[in-house]
Amino acid sequence: MTTIVSVRRNGQVVIGGDGQATLGNTVMKGNVRKVRRLYHDRVIAGFAGGTADAFTLFELFERKLELHQGHLVKAAVELAKDWRTDRMLRRLEALLAVADENASLIITGNGDVVQPENDLIAIGSGGPYAQAAARALLENTELGARDIVEKSLGIAGDICIYTNQFHTIEELASKA
């Protein structure tokens, strides 16, 4: 598993993730890049779940973004529809956290597209820890989005055995 966290604050949207890949109880790799830029660097996305499944979903999502000229919500809904109805895709086990300048979304393997409250996303095994940390920092500090993501990932990595301290963080300017 993993931890992916996204925060939108003060004109910035940031998604960060750890780099640990496990096979059962064994750490296989510690520097996986689970956060990427898509669609001409106008969308950022992170994944939690099986690595091969997630890379497949990244490719499919990028195709949907191209098809819908970068419209994040439309591309997410269309990917979720395909994910729900296609027999091969239904077997993929991953969650995507995606964001552009206007919206932050979670796309699930059940075909759900969720726009979270307060534009805070935290998914994966360390998600609850990162979410609690990010929420506390959002409510009680003036830290920027990147700092909140960094600190939340650090806290999750200290608590969750499936999350490490190797972080990939991407950010975009935000209108929302």
Curated annotation (Swiss-Prot):
Q: Which UniProt keywords apply?
A: Allosteric enzyme, Cytoplasm, Hydrolase, Metal-binding, Protease, Sodium, Threonine protease
Coiled-coil spans are none
Protein activity control: Allosterically activated by HslU binding.
Quote the EC number: 3.4.25.2
Q: What is one Gene Ontology biological process annotated in the Swiss-Prot or TrEMBL record?
A: proteolysis involved in protein catabolic process
Q: What does this protein do?
A: Protease subunit of a proteasome-like degradation complex believed to be a general protein degrading machinery.
PANTHER family documented for this protein: ATP-DEPENDENT PROTEASE SUBUNIT HSLV (PTHR32194:SF0), METALLOPROTEASE TLDD (PTHR32194)
- This chain's protein is named ATP-dependent protease subunit HslV
Organism of this sequence? Pectobacterium atrosepticum (strain SCRI 1043 / ATCC BAA-672) (Erwinia carotovora subsp. atroseptica)
